[in-house]
Swiss-Prot record:
InterPro entries: Ankyrin_rpt (IPR002110), Ankyrin_rpt-contain_sf (IPR036770). ANK repeats lie at residues 217-246, 333-362, 421-451, 512-542. Keywords: ANK repeat, Repeat. This is Putative ankyrin repeat protein L769. It comes from the Viruses. It comes from Acanthamoeba polyphaga mimivirus (APMV). Signal peptide: none annotated.
């Protein structure tokens, strides 16, 4: 152990005392970004009798005492040989170039340290802010690096953010002169193709740079310029007298900017042009239609049935842009538009269909089955008749939308039609944590004052765990008969531990109830925990759960380890996952004491199953659960 070399990663004081996190020399490069100039070499202080030192992950360690050995420079000749033992030459070259330490690159070259295989394909693009000096260094030493000259050319042409335009031209001129001095046949076609794929590189100066070296297909450049909307390049190509077919250019996914350029040049836009532009294969029809309208290119005389059919079938939302500016009512099937508008909840389009005579009763079966309750309520308010057919009732809609109080009119209809009962709906939606007003309404429809909702405990637990207490007071004041389990949970949440103990003591079935245990552990109350341990002292399965649930709180965890015979080494994965889910500081404790084993418990493990049963997804982050 002592023969290894360790470096300080970070210090945590979350436990009230420092915990030092270290990594070994194998992980130096991967665990330090390229801006870090030096790291601190340390070793555990073996003189301390209460020293703890664990490897919680391969090559990563936690300890409570360290001795600083030395500050180790990462940009120094003295450390290169050691770094090369554990990382690729590519990573070292990258680090040295980013810090402009060309002297260290010289050292690597002197030692004949080649780039790792295939690194030539991406080293230039992986170096952040590669400056002129570093780039020229690579060019002048390319007999050693063996990067393809085409790769270097493409990088220089593209790299307009870090290197000025004048410098780019200077480097390209230098490259061409350099290459002409030795026997290398460069593939300029590859470079031209690269220039064409990016609007930042498709520039006149770049085209002219290679025009004398290779036959350029100006028609390909024209089509690409039309796609990018580069009017400067379009004008440049047209001035060369290139003949073109306007319709063929339009088929090349022409941008609105380029289209406007050609209109200004005298090209006439007819319905053929529009139908070529707007076709089932068109990319982003929504944006295209908006642009055609905003640029005054699309006019009433260009609106045809064929165009409207294409839009309806490919992007119904785009019809919304047309109804405000054009008269299309006699060219469309209102029922077809209504169905699509309902399917995607496009309210403006729905209103337009209704205002233009669409029969509000015709689609009620579809609406009841497929649409959100807000739409259903809207149609009912307009006088639509809900069919007396229970098959048009879709209970899943309520489960989806019960978190919003605008579904109450929909619920009233369901209950009045006797498609379902308020009591049954409550039982079906309770785990989805419905809006408090939805619960209040449903309870007002129930005459059974002895109603119990077993799964309501999960709502209490979820709100308690994730600080979502805004509905809690309303929940416990509702007209509900709480069962014993729920009463105990309420007492624990409200801090009435004496009442909770009395209820548990008089109800034997609740002694080893895991929901009650879970809430107790979340309360961090040692006295309540001691009570539960006393009455379950011989229940090994229960004590195992106590250990797992305690792992989010160091005080509780230490208490359980010291006062039970459960071996924490047998439950490392469960404790690691549980504490990590709640973003608990106890993760540091687990790592320091060799109880940490990552967060990779299996789906459908017993912890996963229990947490799902109380409405918590252990695999989702704590913050995401809070937003539910």
């Amino acid at each position: 152990m002592e023969s290894k070399t360790y470096y300080l990663d970070k210090i945590s004081n979350n436990l009230g005392y420092p915990v030092y996190f270290l990594f070994d020399e194998i992980h130096v490069i991967e665990n330090t970004n390229n801006n870090i100039k030096e790291i601190i070499q340390v070793e555990p202080d073996y003189s301390k009798p209460d020293l703890k030192f664990t490897e919680y992950r391969n090559g990563f360690f936690a300890t409570n005492y360290i001795i600083e050995v030395a500050k180790v420079p990462l940009l120094d000749v003295t450390t290169i040989e050691k770094l090369l033992q554990y990382c690729s030459s590519f990573k070292l070259y990258k680090r040295f170039f980013e810090n402009n330490r060309l002297d260290l690159c010289d050292y690597l070259i002197t030692k004949d340290i080649k780039l790792t295989r295939r690194s030539d394909k991406f080293i230039l693009n992986r170096i952040k802010k590669l400056d002129k000096d570093s780039l020229m260094y690579i060019i002048n030493h390319n007999d050693f690096f063996q990067i393809r000259w085409e790769v270097i050319f493409k990088f220089v042409v593209s790299n307009i953010t870090n290197i000025s335009s004048d410098t780019n031209n200077e480097i390209i001129d230098y490259l061409m002169t350099l290459i002409n001095n030795f026997d290398y046949k460069i593939d300029y076609d590859e470079i031209i193709k690269h220039i064409m794929i990016d609007p930042r590189t498709l520039k006149i100066k770049n085209i002219e740079l290679f025009a004398e070296l290779v036959d350029i297909n100006y028609m390909d450049i024209l089509k690409q310029a039309c796609f990018f909307g580069s009017t400067e390049i379009i004008n440049y190509v047209l001035n060369k007298g290139i003949e073109y077919d306007f319709y063929e250019l339009i088929k090349s996914d022409i941008s609105i900017t380029a289209l406007k350029f050609f209109i200004d040049k005298g090209h006439y836009i007819d319905d053929t042009t529009i139908n070529i532009l707007v076709n089932p294969e068109s990319k982003n029809i929504n944006r295209l239609i908006r642009s055609l309208i905003n640029q005054k290119i699309l006019t009433q005389d260009l609106i045809t049935k064929q165009l409207l059919e294409t839009i309806i079938k490919t992007d119904i939302h785009s019809i919304e842009y047309l109804i405000n500016d054009f008269d299309i009512i006699n060219m469309v099937d209102l029922d077809e538009i209504m169905i699509e508008a309902l399917r995607y909840n496009f309210t403006e389009l729905i209103d337009w269909c209704i205002n233009n005579g669409s029969d509000i009763n015709r689609h009620m079966s579809f609406i009841m089955k497929e649409c959100c309750p807000e739409i259903v309520s809207k149609f009912i308010e307009l006088g639509a008749q809900v069919p007396n057919d229970v098959s048009c009732y879709n209970p899943e809609l309520i489960e989806i939308y019960c978190m919003y109080d605008d579904c109450i009119p929909y619920l009233k209809t369901i209950i009045e039609k006797e498609f379902d009962t308020a009591e049954n709906i409550i039982h079906n939606i309770i785990e989805n944590r419905p809006h408090i007003q939805v619960l209040k309404y449903l309870l007002s429809e129930i005459t059974n004052h002895d109603l119990t909702i077993p799964k309501l405990a999960n709502m209490f637990i979820h709100d308690y765990c994730y600080c979502s207490s805004e509905n809690y007071g309303d929940l416990i004041s509702l007209n509900i008969q709480f069962n014993i389990e729920q009463q105990i949970i309420i007492q624990i949440i409200e801090g009435n531990f004496i009442n909770a103990k009395e209820l548990i003591f008089t109800n034997y079935d609740c002694y080893n109830n895991l929901k009650i245990l879970f809430v107790t552990m979340m309360s961090n109350n040692i006295d309540m925990l001691e009570f539960l341990l006393e009455i379950n002292n011989y229940d090994q399965d229960y004590l195992q759960w106590v250990l797992i649930f305690s792992s989010r709180n160091v005080t509780m965890l230490e208490y359980i380890i010291n006062n039970t015979n459960i071996d924490p080494n047998l439950f490392k994965q469960e404790m690691s996952t549980f504490s990590s889910h709640f973003k608990s500081y106890s993760v540091d404790y687990l790592k320091l004491n060799d109880y940490y084993e990552g967060t990779s418990i299996l789906i459908n493990s017993r912890l996963d199953i229990f947490m799902k049963n109380i409405g918590i997804n252990i695999f989702k982050s704590y913050d995401n659960q809070r937003r539910l």
